[in-house]
Amino acid sequence: MVFSDVLQEVSSRVEGSIGYVVMGMDGIPIERLIADRRHNFDMIATESTTLLRSTRQASEELGAGPLRELSFATDQFTVLAVAITDEYILLGALSNESNYGKARFYMKRAALRLEKEFV
């Protein structure tokens, strides 16, 4: 399945989606989908990579293994990152009215499907 199809499927199943991106841990996007232009999704994704890299480094230094998932919430949105591989992630931004558990479920499922594209 193509990346854009997977992103579209997640977005269509999660109300309040702002956007989704498949990207490397270096922050370079492979495919993105913007569902709600009221927020600057590209900026959200770019700034989130700094946090992802720091958290990944902390996880490694603690000997806790690779980073698998990270989320944070603000007054305006929630960001969820799910590892596809050790080097690639699926990052989503959701409105605070979104069902976080539902988004997490569909994003984890999507990450498993996307992992096959990197093997």
Q: Whereabouts are the PLM-identified features?
A:
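Non-catalytic interaction/Regulatory regions outside core domains
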Residues: 1-119
